Curated annotation (Swiss-Prot):
Belongs to the frog skin active peptide (FSAP) family. Ocellatin subfamily. Expressed by the skin glands. Has antibacterial activity against Gram-negative bacterium E.coli ATCC 25922 (MIC=300 uM) but not against S.pneumoniae ATCC 700603, S.choleraesuis ATCC 14028 or Gram-positive bacterium S.aureus ATCC 29313. Shows virtually no hemolytic activity and no cytotoxicity. GO terms for cellular component: extracellular region. This is Ocellatin-PT1. The modification Valine amide is found at V66. It comes from Leptodactylus pustulatus. Residues 1-22 form the signal peptide. It is found in: Secreted. It comes from the Eukaryota. It holds the Pfam family FSAP_sig_propep.
């Protein structure tokens, strides 16, 4: 009976350790994804600002001709 208890304890312990390792890796992956999203947002903001400036410049040129 003691052998079964030790075996069960070992299986549960190893299962918890592997779960905690997987959980830690998952958190790291989520953090990496968040960093990528922030970089994408930064790039889109730059493109959006450049587009606004381009449209404003074009509208200024059109207004000068009229």
């Amino acid at each position: 009976m003691a052998f079964l208890k030790k075996s069960l304890f070992l299986v549960l312990f190893l299962g918890l350790v592997s779960l905690s390792i997987c959980d830690e890796e998952k958190r790291q992956d989520e953090d990496d994804d968040d960093d990528d999203d922030e970089e994408k947002r930064g790039v889109f903001d730059i493109i959006k600002d450049a587009g606004k400036q381009l449209v404003a410049h074009a509208m200024g040129k059109i207004a000068e001709k009229v």
